[in-house]
From Swiss-Prot:
Belongs to the frog skin active peptide (FSAP) family. Bradykinin-related peptide subfamily. Pfam families: FSAP_sig_propep (PF03032). Its main location: secreted. Expressed by the skin glands. This is Kininogen-1.
């Protein structure tokens, strides 16, 4: 009975450790994907709107 408890505890512990490692890797990949998306969006914004000097307006005011 004692051997059964120890082996069951060991199996559950190893399962918990492997599960937490998988969750950590999953979280890391999601963060990397989000960072890539943010970088792509900022690059698109730079391409769409060129930088203008402060106070510059494309409209002429007479």
């Amino acid at each position: 009975m004692d051997i059964l408890k120890k082996s069951l505890f060991l199996v559950l512990f190893l399962g918990l450790v492997s599960f937490s490692i998988c969750e950590e890797e999953k979280r890391d990949t999601e963060e990397e994907e989000n960072d890539d998306e943010i970088e792509e969006e900022s690059e698109e914004k730079k391409r769409e709107a060129p930088e203008r000097p402060p106070g510059f307006t494309p409209f002429r005011i007479y």
